[in-house]
Amino acid sequence: MKRPGDGRQESPSSTARPDNRNTGSRGEEIATSFLGQQGYRILERNFRCKGGELDIVARAPGERSLVFVEVKTRRDRSYGPPQLAVTPFKQRQISKAALTWLSRNHLHDSQARFDVIAILLEDGGRHSIEHIVNAFELAY
């Protein structure tokens, strides 16, 4: 997209970033509410460290294991379903962040799993949600 007056091109992705952040934040709110309704106890949201980020850290109902939840949200399916964005590279980043979280919280020996919540935002404020339990294993 051309900027007026300077002849430079601006990439479409840079103009969409604030909207993408809003979409992601909305998805994380939906996912947090969904997990709460399912009986999950939310321990932390948006944990950031040098290696990556964790969207949600929770404890599953009736379980001692921790659940690291990656939330992927899209407004349409033009790039495929949201969960396809959890690439092997992203899985490694999430795994590193999870190991850091466990270390900082002195929970080295805890059992944990990695879930993905895929959200598709629809017209009229509706959404569809898919919770993929054990979506991937710890990746190095």
Swiss-Prot record:
Chain intervals for the UniProt region annotation (Disordered): 1-27
Protein's recorded name: UPF0102 protein Ppro_1186
NCBIfam families noted in UniProt: PRK12497.1-3, PRK12497.3-3, PRK14675.1, YraN family protein
Protein family membership: Belongs to the UPF0102 family.
InterPro entries registered for this protein in UniProt: Restrct_endonuc-II-like (IPR011335), tRNA_endonuc-like_dom_sf (IPR011856), UPF0102_YraN-like (IPR003509)
A GO molecular-function descriptor: nucleic acid binding
Cystine bridges: none
Pfam families reported in the protein's UniProt record: UPF0102
Bias-annotated ranges (Polar residues): 10-25
